[in-house]
Amino acid sequence: MNRNNPLEVLGHVSWLWASSPLHRNWPVSLFAINVLPAIRANQYALLTRDNYPVAYCSWANLSLENEIKYLNDVTSLVAEDWTSGDRKWFIVWIAPFGDNGALYKYMRKKFPDELFRAIRVDPKTHVGKVSEFHGGKIDKQLANKIFKQYHHELITEVKNKSDFNFSLTG
């Protein structure tokens, strides 16, 4: 696969999207807003086996302001938002052929000292929650300290936003 050919990458991601029980019924507009900016910004990982795509993830580097916007409406990110800060969020994670573990290991190795968060939705209840992930070499206590700081900054900012709809309680 040629990572320098965005159409080839797009084709591989389309194949994975269509093969995923979670993603295949989503509208094309979600594909466009969740995949195209990642390819343009080179903020994605695409795993292949025998030249066939097996797993894909994308991430956005959000500012606090855009993080709040994303949590309030996961369809709200525009291309500029993807590179607006240093708060990493997994936007898409697809591994329809059983390669979730391989993608997880790849990302922990690619970003050994980084922290990521993701919104994960329970397919049965449709309830979302924020999950946290960290690279393979970062000290867990340090990671927890930084995540707590993220939470504090987030809660401080959303307290004054009357239009914020995301629940901060479990």
UniProtKB/Swiss-Prot annotation:
InterPro entries noted in UniProt: RTX_toxin-activating_protC_bac
A GO-annotated cellular component: cytoplasm
Main location group: cytoplasm
Protein's cellular compartments: Cytoplasm
Activity control, per UniProt: The acyltransferase activity is inhibited by heme.
Mod. after translation: Proteolytically cleaved by the protease systems ClpAP, ClpXP and FtsH, leading to its degradation.
Reactions that this protein is recorded to catalyse: tetradecanoyl-[ACP] + L-lysyl-[protein] = N(6)-tetradecanoyl-L-lysyl-[protein] + holo-[ACP] + H(+)
Record text on subunit structure and interactions: Monomer.
Family: Belongs to the RTX toxin acyltransferase family.
Function: Protein-lysine myristoyltransferase that catalyzes myristoylation of the protoxin (HlyA) at two internal lysine residues, thereby converting it to the active toxin.
Protein name, entry field: Protein-lysine myristoyltransferase HlyC
Organism of derivation: Escherichia coli
